[in-house]
């Protein structure tokens, strides 16, 4: 009864080849993504570490004196794009590393 219902929905008889081919194609795509992920692991770890340091620095920029008025008038993020602000400038540079020119997230306008 179940087989007849499935055949009716698809308009043709199912066989193992269709299912295997689909599963194989999905496995190939998965393997490709896994390889890309492994290849980018070192860069991604570096980016996470830089972001962690930058987030800490953002919380204390005024207290540490790295982003004080009047230089931070438009914000410490903008100041870090213009001059060296510890941790934040490094994070902004690393964000674009390994990416195409127009895919640098928040930094797309100042990197080129």
Curated annotation (Swiss-Prot):
What is the predominant subcellular site recorded for this chain? plastid
Q: Where is the transit peptide?
A: 1-27
List the keywords (alphabetical).
Chloroplast, Membrane, Photosynthesis, Photosystem I, Plastid, Thylakoid, Transit peptide
Note the topology in the membrane. Peripheral membrane protein
Q: Which GO terms describe its biological process?
A: photosynthesis
Into which family does the record put it? Answer: Belongs to the psaN family.
Could you tell me what this protein does? May function in mediating the binding of the antenna complexes to the PSI reaction center and core antenna.
Q: What protein is this chain from?
A: Photosystem I reaction center subunit N, chloroplastic
Question: Where does this protein come from, organism-wise?
Answer: Zea mays
Recorded name of the encoding gene: PSAN
